[in-house]
A protein has these predicted regions:
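Tubulin/FtsZ superfamily GTPase core signature
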Residues: 1-366
Length: 366
């Protein structure tokens, strides 16, 4: 049977915008892998950081305000910079059905600019999802306060938002884990969120999930989570679900969610285990939740391995936190010393350019 080739025009157009130094680093890592139908855009007030990303489409904001030198820890400069570049940003967003915005909250550019860009994106009619990190405790209370204030503004401007607190990394690392690997583990969570959704929509599957399905779950949904789990052997589907919904890097649990999209990915899927996975998901979400299911093949998985992705949203203010989440991880069930294992389709990089390094460490490096 001849292989069907799907023209690019049939895919939902997805744009991923990395804002500030942290957001730029994240999309730089994403850009190294292949994502069908995804366009990357880097936005920054810092010209040096902007060019380090290697992203083809770059938008330098705040030329008259920050003179290309960044925004420090002043979100007002980031906000003004985005306002100044509104026309250019609108043009870049135009035509997208779905926009992911990613940034490290707590600084100036990412925190200040992301609500403005989110508002522009929503005005175009695009489904707008923010995927952000919160700073480490050791970065100080002022940076945390800036992040919380920025998040409060952001959540009013997007359809859904996913938050990864940097401090959660201490749940899966030991004292010998290199700094580079620790930051990569955080970046990978954000990468999985974008890549997982993009592939779900744009890669034809056994049971297809289309853009309208994703929109049903995420439009005006507020706080959301995405979890990806892998497992092999007996009860692999059940174990993959457990891993997906209890990652120690994710702050919340899908318990009580009113909108759930989950996908089962493997090369030898069995109907019984798909049913088991579906039951596991349905038991923890709201009884009246909208549950959308997809299944697809992925020959990058190891033989006998299964991968499950769960997107949950619509908590209606009733959020359960993953306080005991150390038991499972999308990275590894048991973290080996000096090594973080990541899924086989992600190759760890150790370049300092891929890190969201706290400001005080960047200054020391200079």
């Amino acid at each position: 049977m001849p292989q069907i080739k799907y023209p690019l025009e049939t895919f939902a157009k997805i744009k991923v915008i990395g804002i500030g130094g942290g957001g730029g680093n994240i999309i730089s890592r994403m850009n190294r892998g292949q994502m069908r139908g995804v366009e990357f855009i880097a936005v920054n007030t810092d010209v040096q950081d902007l060019h380090k990303t290697g992203i083809r489409e770059k938008i330098h904001i705040g030329k008259n305000i920050s003179k290309g030198l960044g925004a420090g820890m002043n979100p007002e400069i980031g906000r003004q910079a985005a306002e100044e570049a509104k026309t250019q940003l609108e043009e870049a967003i135009k035509g997208a059905e779905m926009v992911f915005l990613t940034a490290g909250l707590g600084g100036g550019t990412g925190t200040g600019a992301i609500p403005i860009i989110a508002e522009l994106s929503k005005e175009t009619g695009a489904l707008t999802i923010a995927v952000v990190t919160k700073p480490f405790f050791f970065e100080g209370s002022r940076r945390s306060q800036i992040a919380e204030e920025g998040l409060a503004k952001l959540k009013e401007k997007v359809d859904a938002y996913i938050v990864v607190p940097n401090d959660r990394i201490f749940n899966i690392i030991d004292q010998d884990t290199p700094l580079s690997q620790a930051f990569e583990a955080i970046d990978d969570i954000l990468k999985y969120a974008v890549k997982g959704v993009a592939e779900l929509i744009n890669v034809p599957g056994i049971i297809n999930v289309d853009f309208a399905d994703v929109k049903t779950v995420l439009q005006d949904a507020g706080l959301a989570l995405i979890g990806i789990g892998k497992a092999a052997g007996q009860e692999r589907a059940m174990n993959a679900v457990k891993s997906a919904i209890s990652s120690p890097l994710i702050e919340i649990s899908p318990h009580g969610a009113r909108g759930v999209l989950f996908s089962v990915i493997g090369n030898d899927l069995k109907m019984a285990e798909i049913n088991d996975a579906a039951k596991s998901v349905s038991e923890i979400v709201d009884p009246s939740a909208k549950i959308i299911f997809g299944a697809m093949e992925d020959n990058r998985l190891k033989k006998g391995e299964i991968k499950i992705m769960v997107i949950a949203a619509g908590f209606n203010g009733l959020v359960k936190y993953n306080n005991d989440a150390k038991q499972q991880s999308i990275i590894s069930e048991k973290l080996p010393v000096k090594k973080i294992e990541v899924p086989s389709d992600i190759t760890p990089k150790t370049s300092s350019e891929s890190l969201e390094i706290p400001a005080f460490l960047r200054r020391r490096k200079k």
